[in-house]
Amino acid sequence: MVRKFDFLVIGSGIAGMSFALKVAHKGTVALICKAGLEEANTYFAQGGIASVTNLAVDNFDKHIEDTMIAGDWISDRAAVEKVVRNAPGQISELIKWGVNFDKKDNGEFDLHKEGGHSEFRILHHKDNTGAEIQESLIEAVKQHPNITVFTNFFAVEIITQHHLGIIVTRYTPGIKCYGAYVLNENTGEVDTFLSKVTIMATGGCEAVYRNTTNPLVATGDGIAMVYRAKGAVKDMEFIQSHPTALYHPGDRPCFLITEAMRGYGGVLRTMDGKEFMQKYDPRLSLAPRDIVARAIDNEMKQRGDEHVYLDVTHKDPEETKKHFPNIYKKCLSIGIDITKDYIPVAPAAHYLCGGIKVDLDGQSSIRRLYAIGECSCTGLHGGNRLASNSLIEAVVYADAAAKHALSVLERYDFNEDIPEWNDEGTISNEERVLITQSMKEVNQIMESYVGIVRSNTRLTRAWNRLDILYEETEKLFKSSKATRELCELRNMINVGYLITRQAMERKESRGLHYTIDYPHPQK
């Protein structure tokens, strides 16, 4: 089946839905989501969204400086300034769409402070800010007559000149995107979505790791599709681990214990109750995430422990319950009362700082294709993301991409020559064990060899193991009917390869990339 829309948005988190809402008054929008509208990373973001609002003590320059320091000075300053200066306007837009940020009794925003921030500037809704934003955007999207939502539709490949029989390489100038081939899981058929403009908003790829705070839909689909289409992908080695995921064996994804809990006064302790952050950083438990994650990883490896503890037992119990109701409830469900007991925590893959390379308008290296949100690499985060900068980046770049796309829309038309998906000669694969086992292998490879601390030996081993899986999976893909699981496995292997290759290419330790073979940053 062929479907035509002015805008094809792949992904239904804060980036994709914001973009859809910003362009829908000017054209038809298809919003593709591989599961339900709630199954986005945005929904799981607890901490908040960073924006300079209290001008009595805070200003743009401070937020810019904090972001540059966290990014280990390799952030793109133009991208940093763009996000920071445009943040307040986008906060107003979110409020207009129905997002409720917590306020104090005097009507001012109740701002949090998180690791790496010099001032209180994190707007939040209790400890489930992402869910509040996601639910508000879902309501706005559902009410818009020009937006059609496709749930359980999985994008398999973006369509370029390659599908017209033209040879496309990484050096081909002017590659264009004409839409995407999308698997309709309701029918099992691959539909052709033709568009004037396509927006990749598919989120991160942390489900390639065994321990992750991300929903298991975060398989790097958009990044893999763009890479296969010969688009530019950048900074994939910078995978941020959240230092404090709840340690509860069997949970996947891991439950996230927000950064704000350390900002609130939480203290990290070893399993025998000793504080340890003084050995690593003068900011103690409020040091940036990469330092805290490496410190925890080091303590665990040195001592042979499975986790460390986060302690808020010295804080007022009622205040703790009020600030962190979801964390209190989750921990209580597994027998931990956080007002009396230490919380067992360990690092887990949390956020990708790299992704599809884009310019200040969110344009990728492929024409007519934009990338926004976590799947993109704007240059904002550099070597490490400052806490709560991701949600604001998503809306600022959704706004920039929307403005640019609207300004060029009339130049484009649908390409009617695109052939429909051809799966003649393929068979339905009943051997799901081949796919699930290979997924487990990817998780194990990435966790063991491409984790928080890396080495040339580990990365080479990961490369060799992934290469075997790649050959097996491509063979399976060519002979089988497309299924979501098979496509996800293929994407996970592509993304695992990109993380590993770009980690091998960086001959230094910087930001989130730490290797024992090159322990210092290059000058």
What is each stretch, according to the model?
Residues 75-88, 121-139, 150, 212-220, ...:
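Short beta-strand to alpha-helix junction loop
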Residues 1-6, 22, 28, 36-38, ...:
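Glycine- and aromatic-enriched mobile tails/lids
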Residues 7-31:
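N-terminal Rossmann-like FAD-binding beta1-loop-alpha1 element of flavoenzymes
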